[in-house]
Amino acid sequence: MNFKNVKVPKGPGGGVIAAVVIGGLSLYGATHTLYNVDGGHRAIVFNRLVGIKDKVYPEGTHLMIPWFERPIIYDVRAKPYLVESTSGSRDLQMVKIGLRVLTRPMADQLPEVYRSLGENYRERVLPSIIHETLKAVVAQYNASQLITQRESVSREIRKILTLRAANFHIALDDVSITGLTFGKEFTAAIEGKQVAAQEAERAKFIVEKAEQDKRSAVIRAEGEAKSAQLIGQAIANNQAFLTLRKIEAAREIAQTISRSANKVYLSSNDLLLNLQAMDLDVKPKK
């Protein structure tokens, strides 16, 4: 059999396969030559030939060379970082201090941050510099001063931390002390001091109240003496005053008896006060 004259027919799916291959390559190129940088982020590019490029790419869509380049995206928004550290104060009291810092990478220094620290720069840098700073600052204050001068302590910690973090191209937006915990002995001493202060305030209040009561008693006695003097003068000058007092007393007795549950029988003429014998026509003494 002569195979030279045999013709192999072309497959009907050859064009479809070529189209699929071209489409796949196009899709691969489109997805691997474009990348997006979201809001609050920045990107740097690693090139297989030159390494990390010095350019920092802002938010938006950017081009890159497939396989030769890949983007490294950083979140440049401030994030909180919490640390707790136990340090000794100047008076040798052990203090557990909690610190909260807001940090972010310096956007224009991202290539250097990646070269020296990588992507997990926070875990590499912040624990060490925060612990060291806390120990240095707490050692300058007594335990009581850490409470009374808390704002000054926080300001000193922020000043030192800002300088230390800047050496690693990290910016600190805020530093705050979240908690102070002292040893049992110091805590007991503080509570005892507070109780003593409260007792002193209570004793002071009692003394002041006694003085006030004393002054009130003196004023009341003076008022009663003056009242007795005026009553005596009124009786001496006009007997009608005594008659008025008897009538008022009779009225009070009548009201009391009327409200009483017991049955009492009195003369309606004088209520046992000898009102009938009163001389109501009293002339003032001359």
UniProtKB/Swiss-Prot annotation:
Keywords from the named record: Membrane, Mitochondrion, Mitochondrion inner membrane, Signal-anchor, Transmembrane, Transmembrane helix
CDD domains, A to Z: SPFH_prohibitin (cd03401)
Pfam families recorded: Band_7
InterPro entries xrefs: Band_7 (IPR001107), Band_7/SPFH_dom_sf (IPR036013), Prohibitin (IPR000163)
Gene3D superfamilies per UniProt: Band 7 domain (3.30.479.30)
Mitochondrial matrix topological domain residue ranges: 1-12
Mitochondrial intermembrane domain ranges by topology: 36-286
Known tissue expression: Mostly expressed in proliferative tissues, including vasculature, shoot and root apical tissues.
Listed transmembrane segments: 13-35
Primary localization class, coarse: mitochondrion
Membrane topology per record: Single-pass type II membrane protein
Cellular component annotations (GO), alphabetically ordered: mitochondrial inner membrane; mitochondrion; plant-type vacuole
Locations listed in the record: Mitochondrion inner membrane
Family: Belongs to the prohibitin family.
Function: Prohibitin probably acts as a holdase/unfoldase for the stabilization of newly synthesized mitochondrial proteins.
Subunit comment: Component of a prohibitin multimeric complex in mitochondrial membranes.
Entry-linked PANTHER family: PROHIBITIN (PTHR23222), PROHIBITIN-2 (PTHR23222:SF1)
Name of protein: Prohibitin-6, mitochondrial
